[in-house]
Amino acid sequence: MDLSLLLTLAVIHAVALISPGPDFAIMVKIATQQSRSTAVAAAVGISIAILAHTILSLTGVSLLIKSSHTLYLLVQIVGASYLAWMGFDALRAGLAILAKRKMSARVHAGTNDDAVISAGDVEGVASVAGGLGGAMSRRQGFLTGLYTNLLNPKALVFFLTLFSALITPSVTTSTKIASAILLLSLSLAWFGFLAVMLSKAQVQLKLQRLTPVIDAVIGVIFMSVALAIYSNLLLTA
């Protein structure tokens, strides 16, 4: 077993894990707005997706996908579309929460402007905010984490590049298996840490007022990644 290779993989993957991106963003959103069990489920989902990318890269499947123009184009379009939808959804949720708070404040203040605010108006905005930022089940949390990483074309390219550079034909099967276990363990440790720490009641309470801001930032991150992928597709077309 090549310990120096495993150490190199660990360092590179650790840096990638803590870097801001879709995985980190979705963990912050879920952990600060959902239950701890849902946040942990999301952490497991992201980690399983990372394991899948690792296996696909080690077995050469990712290389086949990257080598096929049509297949890789499809992967990029689907992935970018998913990230764009997630970003739009986060932005819409943040705006809905802001609208709900403004309406509630005007109602409590007893404002009697020309525009009459009815209970139905408040409930309507509340239902939109609830539908977008409402409670998620553990299954929903797991699938959100899974799809966020698995459908991200940049993740596929990252792992393909990483293993293409470090895993040579001379590397033993035991080292390959150990590398997959190592990356899975590091992913579970990091995202599990975020899930536990950010889902604490004190943390969620402090960040509650910042929920629209968090949603907006996350929306921008997702849509920026999607835009970068779309732009690259147009430039290379």
Question: Model-derived features: where do they sit?
Answer:
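Juxtamembrane boundary at the C-terminal end of a transmembrane helix
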Residues: L227-A237
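Hydrophobic/aromatic residues within the transmembrane alpha-helices of Major Facilitator Superfamily
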Residues: A14, I18, L51-A52, F88, ...
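Alpha-helical membrane-protein architecture signal
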Residues: L7, V11, A135-Y147, A178
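Membrane helix-loop-helix hairpins that form the core translocation module of multi-pass transporters
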Residues: L5, S37-Q140, L227
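Interfacial loop-to-transmembrane junctions
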Residues: V196-V220
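Transmembrane alpha-helical segments of integral membrane proteins
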Residues: L56, L188-V203
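Juxtamembrane transmembrane-helix termini in multi-pass membrane transport proteins
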Residues: L3-L73, T161-I177, L182
